[in-house]
Amino acid sequence: MIRTKLSIFFSYFVQNLSSRLYYSLNELTAGLISLLLGFFISTGLSTIPGQTGDWGIIAASLIVAAIELVSKIVYSNKKKYGVRINLLNNLKIGITYGLFVDAFKLGS
């Protein structure tokens, strides 16, 4: 086969696309696992301190402080962070979402 500029371009494009797609799928999978892990952690965070009754305010203040600290790290600068910071942010989002779902379950 003759190597023309068009065939070289397409072969480079396909290789570049497949490597980016592979990296994106790995990052997406890790992000979803982190999100679901945060949802699972929030279930534990809402049930364990609720059993004793006296840890509710302390646990809530620690959770809010941790969420605000992660938000400050992630959203303070405009530069792109690595995968670990994104996973930490997904974990935070999962915890927040799980706590809202538990609050709606208790309210209904």
From Swiss-Prot:
The keyword Chloroplast applies. Its main location: plastid. It is found in: Plastid, Chloroplast. Pfam families: DUF565. GO terms for cellular component: chloroplast. Keywords: Chloroplast, Plastid. It comes from the Eukaryota. Belongs to the ycf20 family. This is Uncharacterized protein ycf20. The gene is ycf20.
